[in-house]
Amino acid sequence: RAVPQHWKSGGANRTAEMTHAPLPPQGVWPSPADARQWPFFHRGIEGEIALRLGQDVTPAQAATLDVEQARRLVDAMCVSIEVVDFRWAEAGAAPTWHKMADSLSHGALVLGEWVPFQPLDWSRQRCVATIGRQPTTEHVGTHPLGDPAFLLPAWLRHITRTGHTAPAGTVVTTGTW
């Protein structure tokens, strides 16, 4: 497989440069997942949305895509949990290039149940997270891009930049909610 199957992608906002990192397959798990045996250093979690390509995307296709065209290439979505991890002593304060070398501070990815993709009003979507006995957190409409699909054109250009086609079934998790 020339193009890795699982990716993370995102940016701080719509005007920021999007960053992308392939994810090691051994650290991508279906929900429910037990992460106790996985080696973490500074573990945290982020609630995210993952999108799955429903068809192959060639480099020529990716080169000209806009967001609406890219949306039509997605067949499914799911809630995902990225286990964020830092292998640098500075953790989240590490320089950007260090974070990029660290798979953008990635530890593992848990994928929920896939459902057919449909555009939603992301400004109204709730994310409620409870971990053990910690206080529950709730976020509404807080995705930094406003719509997780916004990153699709940049991500697809990135993953096809070496001339390889992104196969159907390729997955991207789209940044914290």
What are these regions (language model features)?
Residues 1-147, 161:
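Catalytic-core "active-site belt" of small-molecule-metabolizing enzymes
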Residues 157-159, 176-177:
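Short alpha-helix capping/helix-loop boundary micro-motifs
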Residues 159-163, 167:
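Extended mid-to-C-terminal alpha-helical interaction segments
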Residues 166-177:
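Conserved metal-binding segment of the jelly-roll/cupin
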Residues 150:
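Glycine-rich, small/acidic residue-mixed loop/short-helix segments
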